[in-house]
């Protein structure tokens, strides 16, 4: 476990190395997250002219969930949180967010970006292992940009169906899958 600002990173199920990475650009993104205020991200995006930095740091990606019926009463499980492009808006909308991410570096980027949020916990590790230790049910579970990769991290002959069955166990009775 480690703390970055108000964010707790639970590395209990982290295998010790990142099994997914975009390479050296992630070092640059971690530096940005550590040293550049969020209010300056658009300036950095314009200066760097990098697709990866635009993709991971643009607040435009928040639009994907801003109109969703998520309230301050909701508990959210974000599967595949990446560098936190959506984690922040989920935290502003919901009571709490448990973010699951396979990569420690991406989890660190996420934590530094949102270190002032007091309602985010990041769990680092393969979802199939992490989910066995989730202690609550969620009102909202997000699969934004990760469902199509289920065959890479769900050990099953039918990984997509298995993934949905696993997720279903963690939804409240009236829970929503996004």
Q: What are these language model-derived features?
A:
Residues 1-35:
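N-terminal auxiliary segments of SAM/dcSAM-dependent transferases
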Residues 55-73:
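Conserved alpha-helix/loop element of class I SAM-dependent methyltransferases that forms part
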Residues 73-82:
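Conserved class I S-adenosyl-L-methionine
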Residues 83-94:
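Conserved SAM-binding loop of SAM-dependent methyltransferases across substrates and taxa
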Residues 93-129:
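Class I SAM-dependent methyltransferase SAM/SAH-binding core
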Residues 132-141:
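A short acidic, Gly/Pro-enriched loop at the edge of an enzyme's catalytic core
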Residues 140-157:
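A short SAM/SAH-binding and catalytic strip from SAM-dependent methyltransferases
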Residues 158-176:
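A short glycine-rich, Lys/Arg-flanked "PGG" loop and its adjoining helix->strand segment in the class I
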């Amino acid at each position: 476990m480690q703390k970055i600002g108000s964010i707790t990173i639970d590395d209990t199920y982290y295998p010790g190395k990142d099994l997914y990475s975009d390479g050296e650009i992630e070092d640059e993104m971690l530096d940005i997250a550590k040293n550049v205020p969020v209010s300056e991200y658009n300036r950095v995006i314009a200066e760097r002219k990098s697709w990866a930095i635009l993709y991971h740091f643009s607040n435009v990606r928040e639009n994907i969930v801003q109109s969703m019926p998520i309230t301050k009463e909701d508990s959210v499980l974000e599967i595949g949180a990446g560098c936190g492009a959506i984690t922040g808006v989920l935290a502003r909308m919901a009571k709490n967010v448990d973010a699951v991410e396979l990569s420690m570096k991406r989890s660190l980027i996420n934590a530094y970006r949102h270190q002032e949020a007091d309602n985010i916990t990041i769990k680092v590790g393969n979802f199939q292992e992490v989910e066995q230790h989730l202690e609550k049910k969620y009102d909202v579970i997000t699969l934004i940009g990760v469902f199509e990769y289920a065959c890479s991290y769900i050990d099953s002959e039918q990984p997509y169906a298995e993934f949905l069955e696993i997720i279903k166990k963690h939804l409240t009775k009236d829970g929503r899958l996004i």
